[in-house]
Amino acid sequence: SDKLYAKLSKEVIEKLNIVIRTKGLNAIVKHVSERAEKRIPQPEDTAAIIYTSGTTSKPKGVMLTHRAISMQLTVIPPLFDYNQEDVLLSILPLSHTYECTLGMIYPFSRGAHIYYMDRPPVASALMPALQEVRPTVIASVPLIMEKVYRSKVRPTFEKNALLRTLYGWSPTRKLLHKVAGKKLKALFGGRMRFFAIGGAKFDSEAECFLKEAGFPYGIGYGLTETAPLLAGAVGKMVRIGSTGPALQGVELRLDNVNPATGQGEIVAKTPCCMSGYYKNEEATKDAFTADGWFRTGDLGYIAKDGWVFIKGRLKNMIVGPSGENIYPEDIEEVLNSNPVVAESVVTQENGKLVALVHFDTAALEARYEGLKKLFAESKDQLGQKYSESKEQLEKKMDEVKRELLTYVNNKVNRFSQITKVIDNGCEFEKTPTKKIRRFVYEQRAKNGFVPDSNLA
């Protein structure tokens, strides 16, 4: 069979189905000594060491016990339950606790089917996979749905003046969202019954679309250290901007509450908590309160009915000149709502708020006449118009940045005003779970920004 396989073409191999026959597997242990040691794991034994994403600092190894992971199988079902008919398409790395638990262990425990992609889930690979697999469940990070919304959905409502006018009126906007929602379901294979979103803050504009479109999504909140889920909401219970209430068996409260805002650090008590950080006793000690609650590092507030609202990461928060708490994630959400912005990072440079932006080239070309030609000519260093086009492009991009600066500052409060927009020139450096490595850009800001596109 090996010789025959070697003769097959790549096209034929890709169409082959792999069948594993379990009949006769008992023969493997037939001659094993009865005295062989049985290694039965105990609940408090370490089952996995999974590293944090490393968005704000160096990744830490999180030690999760068998008890912590298995207890997730008791706290998740009241929120959402898999069944044997479910088909899950895995698009996140299994080294991420979110995918490991919700995308593998939990569906396996319910007898669901799981398909794995053999390449990164970029659009050219993901779209065909969705049509082939036709999944009923996907566990995703916000970035993927935000990209779908910005590239596939929002442009359809900006085609002409009539559509823009209709979209600006709430009743017709909801109707347009309903129509677009049906197309989105078809895009995802037509069988989707649960699209889980977690791992980062979800853009409110994209979430508003999903809710009004009737798309079957859910929001989850958790961390690597909590294996991961702490709170969540699905279906009609979803509230835009909230991660939902604490899951069954999980307790959440606020620590170090600011009396003026009612916000504080969210701390958690859960049976799914880590045993500690691998070979890092100091970090482990700092991760818990004196009475044993886990410090999430997230700032937010909890409504009277228990619904959790996250404002941002404690490490990301910027203190303004008069002591104001500034959440860069809120400013970035406004930046990202502009059609020409693909993604952004807000930080401080010499004590002033600045926005580092990755522009959407296609959106820029569609919005500003002549940019497409300038982009092409400015890349051709051997062309006769290289220097002239590059100069014209820089002037045009300065105009774009000024417009974006005005756009943002008209939508944020006075102490969240940004002073400068910097073009990063390319995508931001990210973790395997598509989170921007913020600390990389915060570190660069201390010495004055050098965009990624200019780095050697």
Which residue ranges define each predicted feature?
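Conserved pre-ATP/AMP-binding loop-to-beta segment of ANL
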Residues: N17-Y51, K58, D81-V87
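Adenylate-forming
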Residues: C273, W307-N336, A363-S378, G383, ...
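Structural core segment of the AMP-binding/adenylate-forming
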Residues: S1-A27, A36, G351
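Gly/Ser/Thr-rich phosphate-binding loop
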Residues: N17, T136-A139, V148-V238, A342
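Conserved AMP-binding/adenylation subdomain of ANL enzymes
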Residues: S70-V87, L94-K183, R191
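Conserved ATP-binding/catalytic segment of the ANL
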Residues: A246, R253, A260-G320, S337
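Conserved AMP-binding A3 loop
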Residues: A47-L73
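Conserved C-terminal "lid"/linker of ANL adenylate-forming enzymes
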Residues: E343, G351, E403-A456
